[in-house]
């Protein structure tokens, strides 16, 4: 065929097809769901195009999906009257250009994900090879001729100008040449069951071409005539009777005839137009799966209508788990399908729902929006803003309903707590409502998640604030020296160990009148009695000179050295400034590949070195300073090691780990009575080098 061109599959698509062909996955019926879903998308596109171009439907006015099983030739055909594909579309979409989801799906499959997830990655077409050895795609676009794409998945495909086949007028027909062990999908019952299970709520008619054998009564005229002719010569002449008796004697017989007809499989009207009380759990589950291509049931559903000045209906679903690409920049910002008076408009409308609710899936059908909506109109439309506000409120209602069931809420929180915290960071209007949904482990509840409301209820009467600590992990914060005083006072402290917590608490300043206080920052004022205050002031005076000496040794590494009332057992710790980054935030920002380094210089807080006067180590070091002075080499080494150890225990990282290791090695040598001269000389840390090393940090002082 001179009009045939051969192309090679892009490497990733070849690998994907090989994975599908060789899979031992038993639930192969999902191929039909994927192909029907693609057909529905193609119909959505032509219907949307027809809103601005009335002639788009001229070639074929009816919009439908038709399934035709051909048992004789072992071919299953799925046809739609959608937008169709041009020659270039067939080449690019079905073989040459790999979609971003191709690689993601293969990675997910390699790590044990269910193959029925294929539709979520935009590569559902290739599921056809679960049941077919060869696939043909015949397509006719309004702007091009009719072409046939064909491949047996051997690494290449052909595209041919179709001059001989039946005319499609417009749309696409996929012909699956079925594998010998998959012929059950040519059976009427199997097709009906599969469509009901996966695609019952598709918005377009799904027709099944069925063959029926019907019995028909026909007169035995022909047979009688033949017998008559044969015996005409032999038989004697019989006297003719009148017409009436002749009619009585005429006989009929029953013959079987094969007829072909189309049967509509999805007559159920759109589920969102029905009264919520009439819809069963099974129907919601079926609709959710057909809408999202998920193989699991949803976690929660909210089905409602809004009437009055503005009218719309909606169904919103919370999935059981977060998609793998939930926070990827290129991902669609939401999963809500927007309809206007049952006409599909778009499923990529960023204005419909905020980004932090990007995991919500569902349908919104408005009575008031114009049908010919452009992206610009969507952005500026006041109705959209009202719909958005309503959707957010209903989502919050749904989350509160989930929270009533502890087990369900744990599933929800494990999957979507980051979204709630992103909402707290971005959505000022709903911040108080979102804060009620937050859950944390804490000092007094290390194994249970508690809410902020729970925390306040259990607060002692004299406690004024909500205390929290941020860190890399629960284990890291549980052993933090910052908690020592809180254990002693029996105050609870929330453990915030998700990196996004740092961003959320910068916006969530208080909850129900109680201020949220980070215990790793300076300026922490703990409630104390007059006696405790007098004892603290006495110790501050006693250690004032020692604190000055330590500041001299550490130089610009710290802003100040103070006597602490926060430490019970540890010798010292480091706190950060009120308005700069915490140790945990500093760690997070250092891990950002595209961070603004100039910002780091200002936001990396000046550190306060807090010493515990009741610690034997601090008391002994104070004596050593008084005896030998601040210039003594061992005093400098000990002070620096204390500082670096405090850095680590307070959640910071060391700028020069090798120098720290050398100092520790020197201490080990002393402990083992190894002669110092046997050791390689260790360069002393001068206050000048410390100043140079921390020049960037000093900028913070200028800003303050």
From Swiss-Prot:
One of its GO terms (biological process) is cellular response to heat. One of its GO terms (molecular function) is ATP-dependent protein folding chaperone. Residues 218-233 have a biased composition (Acidic residues). The keyword DNA damage does not apply. The modification Phosphoserine is found at residues 245, 277, 286. The keyword ATP-binding applies. It holds the Pfam family HSP90. A motif (TPR repeat-binding) lies at residues 700-704. ATP binds at residues 38, 80, 99, 125, 375. GO terms for cellular component: cytosol; mitochondrion; perinuclear region of cytoplasm; plasma membrane; protein aggregate center; protein-containing complex. Keywords: ATP-binding, Chaperone, Cytoplasm, Nucleotide-binding, Phosphoprotein. It comes from the Eukaryota. Residues 213-262, 678-704 are annotated as: Disordered. It is found in: Cytoplasm. InterPro entries: HATPase_C_sf, Heat_shock_protein_90_CS, HSP90_C, Hsp90_fam, Hsp90_N, Ribosomal_Su5_D2-typ_SF. Residues 234-262 have a biased composition (Basic and acidic residues). Belongs to the heat shock protein 90 family. The TPR repeat-binding motif mediates interaction with TPR repeat-containing proteins. Homodimer. Molecular chaperone that promotes the maturation, structural maintenance and proper regulation of specific target proteins involved for instance in cell cycle control and signal transduction. Undergoes a functional cycle that is linked to its ATPase activity. This cycle probably induces conformational changes in the client proteins, thereby causing their activation. Interacts dynamically with various co-chaperones that modulate its substrate recognition, ATPase cycle and chaperone function. Interacts with the wee1 protein kinase; which requires swo1 for its activation. This is Heat shock protein 90 homolog. It comes from Schizosaccharomyces pombe (strain 972 / ATCC 24843) (Fission yeast).
């Amino acid at each position: 065929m001179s009009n045939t061109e051969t192309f090679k599959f892009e490497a990733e698509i070849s690998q994907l097809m090989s994975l599908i062909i060789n899979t031992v996955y038993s639930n192969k019926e999902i191929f039909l769901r994927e192909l029907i879903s693609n057909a529905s998308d193609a119909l959505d596109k032509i219907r949307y195009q027809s809103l601005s171009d009335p002639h788009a439907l001229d070639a074929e006015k009816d919009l439908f999906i038709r399934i035709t099983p051909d048992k004789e030739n072992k071919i299953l055909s799925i046809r739609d009257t959608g937008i169709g594909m041009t020659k270039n579309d067939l080449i690019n979409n079905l073989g040459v250009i790999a979609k971003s989801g191709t690689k993601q799906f293969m990675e997910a499959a390699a790590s044990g994900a269910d193959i029925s997830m294929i539709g979520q990655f935009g590569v559902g077409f290739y599921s056809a090879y679960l049941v077919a050895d060869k696939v043909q795609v015949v397509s006719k676009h309004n702007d091009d001729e009719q072409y046939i794409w064909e491949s047996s998945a051997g690494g290449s495909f052909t595209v041919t100008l179709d001059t001989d086949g039946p005319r499609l007028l417009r749309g696409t027909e996929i012909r699956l040449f079925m594998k010998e062990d998959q012929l059950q999908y040519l059976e009427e019952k199997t097709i009906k069951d599969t469509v009901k299970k996966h695609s019952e709520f598709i918005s377009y008619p799904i027709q099944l071409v069925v063959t029926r054998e019907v019995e028909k009564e026909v007169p035995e005229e022909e047979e009688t005539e033949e017998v008559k002719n044969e015996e005409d010569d032999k038989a004697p002449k019989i006297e003719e009777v009148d017409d009436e008796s002749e009619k009585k004697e005429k006989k009929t017989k029953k013959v079987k005839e094969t007829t072909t007809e189309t049967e509509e499989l999805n007559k159920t009207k759109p589920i969102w137009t029905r009264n919520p009380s009439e819809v069963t759990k099974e129907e919601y589950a079926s609709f959710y799966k057909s809408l999202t291509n998920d193989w699991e049931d949803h976690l929660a559903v909210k089905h409602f209508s809004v009437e009055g000045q503005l009218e719309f209906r909606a169904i919103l679903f919370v999935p059981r788990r977060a998609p793998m690409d939930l926070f990827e920049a290129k991902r669609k910002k939401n999963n809500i399908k927007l309809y206007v008076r049952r006409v599909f408009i778009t499923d990529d409308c960023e204005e419909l729902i905020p980004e932090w609710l990007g995991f919500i899936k569902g349908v919104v059908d408005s009575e008031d929006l114009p049908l010919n909506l452009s992206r610009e109109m969507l952005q500026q439309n006041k109705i959209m803003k009202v719909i958005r506000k309503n959707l957010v409120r209903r989502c919050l209602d749904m989350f509160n309903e989930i929270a009533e069931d502890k087990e369900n809420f744990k599933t929800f929180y494990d999957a979507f707590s980051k979204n709630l915290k992103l909402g707290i960071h971005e959505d000022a209007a709903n911040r108080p409502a979102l804060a009620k949904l937050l859950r944390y482990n804490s000092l007094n509840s290390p194994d249970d998640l508690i809410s902020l409301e729970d925390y306040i209820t259990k607060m002692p009467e004299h406690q004024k604030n909500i205390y929290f600590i941020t860190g890399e992990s629960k284990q890291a914060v549980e052993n933090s020296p910052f908690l020592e005083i809180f254990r002693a006072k029996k105050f609870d402290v929330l453990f915030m160990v998700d990196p996004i917590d740092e961003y959320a608490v910068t916006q969530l300043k208080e909850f129900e009148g109680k201020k949220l206080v980070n215990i790793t920052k300076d300026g922490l004022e703990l409630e104390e009695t007059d006696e405790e205050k007098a004892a603290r002031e006495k110790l501050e005076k006693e250690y004032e000179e020692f604190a000055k000496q330590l500041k001299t040794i550490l130089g610009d590494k710290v802003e100040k050295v103070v006597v602490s009332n926060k430490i019970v057992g540890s010798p010292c710790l480091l706190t950060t400034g009120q308005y700069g980054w915490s140790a945990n935030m500093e760690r997070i920002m250092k891990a950002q590949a595209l961070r603004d380094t100039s910002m780091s210089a200002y936001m990396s807080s000046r550190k306060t070195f807090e010493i515990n006067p009741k610690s034997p180590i601090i008391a002994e070091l104070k004596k050593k300073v008084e005896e030998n002075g601040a210039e003594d080499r061992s005093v400098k080494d000990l002070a620096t090691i204390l500082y670096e150890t405090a850095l680590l225990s307070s959640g910071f990282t060391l700028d020069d780990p090798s120098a720290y290791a050398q100092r520790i090695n020197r201490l080990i040598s002393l402990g083992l009575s190894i002669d110092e001269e046997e050791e390689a000389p260790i360069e002393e840390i001068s206050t000048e080098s410390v100043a140079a090393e921390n020049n960037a940090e000093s900028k913070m002082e200028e800003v303050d």
